[in-house]
Amino acid sequence: DVIPEYCSGAVIQESDELFSDHPDMMYQHVIQNRGESKIKYTLKDLAINGLLTDLDYFIISEIKGGEAAYFMNAAYTGHKCWSSVHGVSSTEAMNKLADYVKYETDYSREDILRMLHYMRFVIFMKDYRIEEISEVVGYSEETHDLVYRPVYKRGEFFKDPREN
């Protein structure tokens, strides 16, 4: 996808893998303390800092822990959020993201999923190929789970029932 030039964003990553020539994109990476240095910035530290800036896009290259809570907070407060997380399908990736949020917070799984329903699309990739895309269309109070609409699965696109 393309981020419009009038939008700003932060890209938070462990190593400098993601890049762009976008004029208003801020890049931050993890710093490990080495030797006598006491300076250390984790993905979580950088995510917390990202919430203090005026951004349209909030991007974390790969979520693996407590930074998930701040990513969820950014999504819940209207940022456009992009990240990667390991899962076996597009729908299971959201459950894994909820797990990571749970590590950092005392929110219930249901509360986490209610907040995560602001994430609009989930893309599942395998062997560098898109296998599945799901749209998050809401949260079900009956099943206490996210409600998805399949968009794409292994070469097949699904029609949106909301379109004529």
Where do the protein language model's features map onto the residues?
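Switch/coupling sub-region of P-loop NTPases
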Residues: 2-115
